[in-house]
A protein has these predicted regions:
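Active-site activation/catalytic loop segments of kinase-like enzymes and analogous catalytic loops
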Residues: 111-148, 161-179
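A cross-family kinase active-site recognition segment
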Residues: 1-55, 74-76, 106-107, 186-187
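ATP/Mg2+ or Mg2+-diphosphate-binding catalytic cores
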Residues: 167-209
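Short proline/glycine- and basic residue-enriched helix-capping loop/turn segments at helix->loop/beta transitions
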Residues: 30, 58-65
Length: 209
C-alpha cells in the first residue's frame, strides 16, 4: 500500500499542458445523476427487495444533500477515475512499479482517485476486503508525504463512490436476472449479488451517517 500511495502521488503531481482530456466541472452532480439513473432501474423492478430499495433510497437522499450548488476544482491534476488493485504493477520497489489502464483519465481532483481506490465498494470487488478506518488513514498519511489533499473533499467523494458501486450492482443484478442470454460467469454474478445483500449494505451505510 505504501508503494501505491507513492505511485498515485507521482501521477497526481505530473505536470500537464494542453490535452484532450475532459475537465470535470461538477463531479458530484454528474455522479449523482448517473447513480440515480442506475438505481432507478432496480427501484422500478417488480422483483426489487423492499429492504434493499430502502437502503438505496437512503443513500440517494444523503448524497443529494451533499451536492454543492457551485463547485470548483481546487487543485486540478490527471486522475484515473477507475482505480483498483488491478491497476498497479508492483515491482521490487516504488521506482519499478507502475499504474496501468488509463482509458477514462480526466482532469479532476486527487481526492476522487483516492476515494475510489479506498472505497469499500472498490476493494470488496477485487479482494473481498473492506479496509478499516485505520488502514485508510495510514494510506492517506503516506500519500500526504508526497502531495497534500483535502480530507473533507475526500470524505465526500468516498460517499459518492459507495453510492455508485451499490447502484451499479443493483442495476446489473436486475439486467442479468432478466436476461439469461447476457454473458456473465457465475462468480461475477455472485459478486454483484453480494453488493445488494443486507449485510453488505449495512456495512456501507456507516459512510452515510
Amino acid at each position: 500500500m505504501y508503494i501505491a500511495a507513492y505511485l498515485l502521488s507521482k501521477v497526481h503531481n505530473t505536470p500537464y499542458g494542453d490535452n484532450n482530456l475532459i475537465n470535470a466541472a461538477n463531479p458530484f452532480q454528474l455522479m449523482f445523476d448517473e447513480c440515480k439513473q442506475m438505481a432507478g432501474e432496480y427501484l422500478a423492478w417488480d422483483k426489487a427487495d423492499e429492504k434493499v430499495s430502502s437502503y438505496i433510497n437512503r443513500f440517494l437522499e444523503k448524497c443529494l444533500t451533499l451536492i454543492p450548488e457551485k463547485y470548483s476544482i481546487a487543485n486540478p491534476c490527471i486522475i484515473n477515475t477507475e482505480l483498483n488493485s488491478g491497476n498497479f504493477l508492483i515491482g521490487e520497489g516504488k521506482e519499478d512499479s507502475y499504474v496501468i489502464d488509463w482509458e477514462k483519465a480526466v482532469i479532476g481532483e486527487c481526492e476522487q482517485d483516492l476515494a475510489h481506490f479506498l472505497a469499500p465498494t472498490t476493494t470488496f470487488w477485487k479482494t473481498d476486503i473492506i479496509l478499516l478506518k485505520e488502514e485508510i488513514d495510514e494510506f492517506l498519511e503516506e500519500y500526504n508525504k508526497y502531495r497534500t489533499f483535502d480530507r473533507e473533499r475526500f470524505e465526500r467523494y468516498l460517499i459518492f463512490n459507495c453510492l455508485r458501486g451499490v447502484t451499479w450492482c443493483s442495476m446489473a443484478f436486475r439486467q442479468y436476472s432478466e436476461n439469461d442470454k447476457m454473458l456473465m460467469d457465475e462468480t461475477t454474478f455472485k459478486k454483484i449479488a453480494s453488493y445488494i445483500e443486507l449485510e453488505f449494505l449495512e456495512k456501507v451505510s456507516a459512510y452515510f451517517k
